[in-house]
Amino acid sequence: MRFCFDRLCFATKRPAQNSNSNAPHSSTTVDAPPRPADVDVATVPVATPAPPPQQPVSNLFYADYQKLQPAIIDRDWERDRDTDTDTRSEAKPPDIVEHIEPVEEQRQIHTQIQSPAEIQIQIPPTPPAPSIQIQIQQRYRRHSSAEDRNLNTRRNDSNITEALRKAASMQQEPNANYQFPTDLGLVSIVNNNNNTNTHPSGSNSGSNNNSNINNNLVGGIVTLPAAGGLIGLEHTASGLRLIPAPPTHSDVLTHTLIYGTPPSGAQQLNQDPRSLLHQQELQLQQRYQQLQQLQAQTQGLYTSQGSPVLYHQPSPGSSQPVAIPGATCHSPTQLQPPNTLNLQQQMQSLRISGCTPSGTGGSATPSPVGLVDPNFIVSNYVAASPQEERFIQIIQAKELKIQEMQRALQFKDNEIAELKSHLDKFQSVFPFSRGSAAGCAGTGGASGSGAGGSGGSGPGTATGATRKSGQNFQRQRALGISAEPQSESSLLLEHVSFPKYDKDERSRELIKAAILDNDFMKNLDLTQIREIVDCMYPVKYPAKNLIIKEGDVGSIVYVMEDGRVEVSREGKYLSTLSGAKVLGELAILYNCQRTATITAITECNLWAIERQCFQTIMMRTGLIRQAEYSDFLKSVPIFKDLAEDTLIKISDVLEETHYQRGDYIVRQGARGDTFFIISKGKVRVTIKQQDTQEEKFIRMLGKGDFFGEKALQGDDLRTANIICESADGVSCLVIDRETFNQLISNLDEIKHRYDDEGAMERRKINEEFRDINLTDLRVIATLGVGGFGRVELVQTNGDSSRSFALKQMKKSQIVETRQQQHIMSEKEIMGEANCQFIVKLFKTFKDKKYLYMLMESCLGGELWTILRDKGNFDDSTTRFYTACVVEAFDYLHSRNIIYRDLKPENLLLNERGYVKLVDFGFAKKLQTGRKTWTFCGTPEYVAPEVILNRGHDISADYWSLGVLMFELLTGTPPFTGSDPMRTYNIILKGIDAIEFPRNITRNASNLIKKLCRDNPAERLGYQRGGISEIQKHKWFDGFYWWGLQNCTLEPPIKPAVKSVVDTTNFDDYPPDPEGPPPDDVTGWDKDF
């Protein structure tokens, strides 16, 4: 095939295919292009096509300066993927490198291209330059399936670097040749620095003789990575030709790259040859189209030696060329390399060599001028009319103007990046002034402490602000979420009932199938799903009616039985749903705004359930199961003397196992470490006689009976057979010895360092602040803004040596979001706490509009702000801050207080750099061994049992501790989705589904995974050794706990605090745009 243009020729040579698979691999070193003074023009006969339509000479054609990077490519194909034999071409003389016939699908690409007119090219010769040749062979195995063309590759940058280093060391060793195997395959290094090296033809490579240069290249194929794609250069007896290198999908690809000094192509070696060649194929096809257009536009244009006049081709019957009036030729100016030009510039920079038409002789052939580099191919004429010259000047002026505007735009971009760092304070004010955040009502500081995070000294949980753009940190300020508290008394829940609605079997199965198909609700127990199905009531929506409206606060979840609905967001269509689907499931967790609109396309029949009903079902089934399991355990002698909280822990880890009639639950003589309690059905106990093979019946066991208790005490040989007897099967509650030993411990083993040590200091604080009134406080500055109000830095009148954080919360907004109970709990817990890792509360005030909390000021700023600016912390820094949180948890958990809102936003630094826990709006004091069911926390940090409404306790804090470690080490939490529901689904998949970055060490990863176990009883810190098991973990080896507890350990980051009123570590905040809130005189806060 031949692809030719008016002045540029492309021709392919298709050699015969050879079946010799054992032919040796061959390669040829190509001399550098000639010097500009010695020009060789190879003339090829012109095959003139049909004359194109008349084209006006108004286009600008610039010279194409392309840096040549010669590369020889030899392609072999591995025909059989099941053998290691390569099908290669037959060995050729050293001066010839031929292509193997492309496979059919490769050949089709070429046959689709039309053959235009033949053209002529011009190459300035130059003697060879010293070079280092590095050959790297990469092997790919072809799959036999036509549909699967994915090629597996192995890349090893270190081996490439080693090859380049070896090449550099060979600069002074002529004719050196080294080969060695690597993970990439065979690597060859050849030194061609010998200027007297004789080519295969026998000519001296250092000669400037053009014929020698040509002879050396006869039959050779050299690839030139040009702007439009991979171009092949072939020298034949009729002249030099450019050919398109055939697209390759070969299984064996050998790159031989020739480098001068320095070897600048090292980076190119690291490119994946598959993607590079594919890109070059596409560019080459685009190049064909551009050259066809150019050929049509320049058909018949030529000029004579040294003449500034541009001529048409001679008219038929005439031997004289016709001059083009107003068209002149100019020497070109050097352009940028083509690969940096845009498409329009590439079109303008297509190669046009000044030449004569066939038959006019060589006297009129111009010589190139203005060559800057011998490795450049240039033509030295550009056609332009006087009018076009003016356009050129205008375009150049506009390009200069564009460059100036681009510089100004870059400056503005830098300014924008600077201003984005100040957006936190604005985005923290406006969303919460409207009473909602992130689409959730009653969120983002629903605790009331979101207005200062800490108890006052920082922006806290509810700011909703966007983080400053850091290198690796894109997470926005986390928002706290809280549902309205529910009654958690099992006695009250027993008297709560919801109506049940009749359904046919088809509807019941459809609802069940829809729930099990939902990523979130499929995690519910089957007993809970059955009750939910029973309580769902029917609703019907006519066509074109709204089922769910974006922005509304929802409390109902739907299951669609039949019909079709359209889902849209912000007026844009998202999808169409039909069949059994769950709609609006986030509403059953807490009050939240709908994130999309769902409209009935046809009449729709749905089943619905209210959030209150759903949460009651979840709580009641959990409490009933817990009470039932605890009663079972109390009937077992080895459990009857255990504390109530220990029994509840054991009941949480009991797994229900089912057996069919005739199954051997336990076999005599077998080893075992499990203990069983029968919850349903009957089993038969037998013993095998030693003198006979018959089994002797001993007795029957039923519901409430147990067996295998000796396995928990260390005896692992079974002494009897236990066989399922009931026709309906048997259900057993099972616990293994390891889990039992982790949970059972003497209470004396757990040390509580804080029992009464702070009681006296607490009384002293109360006495000191007893006479301070709200009017005695003077506001200095605002430290933070949150969901319920603001946090102000204040001083008492007449005392400038101390400062405090005054947190003020709007009473009306607390009532609106039903967070009264959380606020009272926060005041009670902080008022009793006396721990150096927890912010101290000194006194509380109230009036008709606000509640006030006077607290310790921590002027070092939020840990979240430092993390945002740094991107992430190293291992040592993360260990220090994690240890501070562990100390705070040790104090709280020893008093049965669950925190529930751990995150960097709720950790403040004092003046020394020690971290203090703040914002106790979600904290709660639990009864011994009891759980709580209120959904609250930050979406990225909530534990699975909180999401599934199974009840949670202090074990949820250990989950969030693992999440905090991950975020401090990486800059982002491990569980992050585009919306809360997606985040919850990621959490339910577990920590084992998360890919850990390399910067997290093995010990840190191990601790995170032990803290973030799906089963709360398996989490480190919740087991037998308590929180001391965390302190003893390998990640904390060598950590100076005593120095931390006594504040003698040097913190990794010491904030700059110049005075007691220095607020430079906090943002500036504007005044409240909404003004004072309305009065609240309901009296709910009489004990505040």
From Swiss-Prot:
EC number from the UniProt entry: 2.7.11.12
Pfam family, one: Pkinase
GO annotation terms (biological process): feeding behavior; habituation; larval feeding behavior; larval locomotory behavior; long-term memory; motor neuron axon guidance; positive regulation of Toll signaling pathway; protein phosphorylation
UniProt feature, compositional bias: Gly residues: 441-461
Molecular function, one GO term: cGMP binding
Record Gene3D superfamilies: Jelly Rolls, Phosphorylase Kinase, domain 1, Single helix bin, Transferase(Phosphotransferase) domain 1
Protein name stated in the entry: cGMP-dependent protein kinase, isozyme 2 forms cD4/T1/T3A/T3B
Chain segments carrying region Regulatory: 70-528
Location of Phosphothreonine modifications: T934, T938
Keywords: ATP-binding, cGMP, cGMP-binding, Kinase, Nucleotide-binding, Phosphoprotein, Serine/threonine-protein kinase, Transferase
Protein residues bound to 3',5'-cyclic GMP 1: G584, E585, L586, A587, R594, T595
Organism in which the protein naturally occurs: Drosophila melanogaster
Positions contributing to 3',5'-cyclic GMP 2 binding: R699, G708, E709, K710, A711, R718, T719
CDD domains membership: CAP_ED, DD_cGKI-alpha, STKc_cGK
Region annotation Disordered: where it falls in the sequence: 15-39, 128-158, 191-211, 305-336, 441-477, 1064-1088
PANTHER family with a match to the protein in the record: CYCLIC NUCLEOTIDE-DEPENDENT PROTEIN KINASE, PTHR24353:SF111
One Gene Ontology cellular component: plasma membrane
Positions contributing to ATP binding: L783, G784, V785, G786, G787, F788, G789, R790, V791, K807
Keyword field contains Transport: no
Catalytic reaction(s) noted: L-seryl-[protein] + ATP = O-phospho-L-seryl-[protein] + ADP + H(+); L-threonyl-[protein] + ATP = O-phospho-L-threonyl-[protein] + ADP + H(+)
Family listed: Belongs to the protein kinase superfamily. AGC Ser/Thr protein kinase family. cGMP subfamily.
Residue ranges of every copy of the Protein kinase domain listed in the record: 777-1036
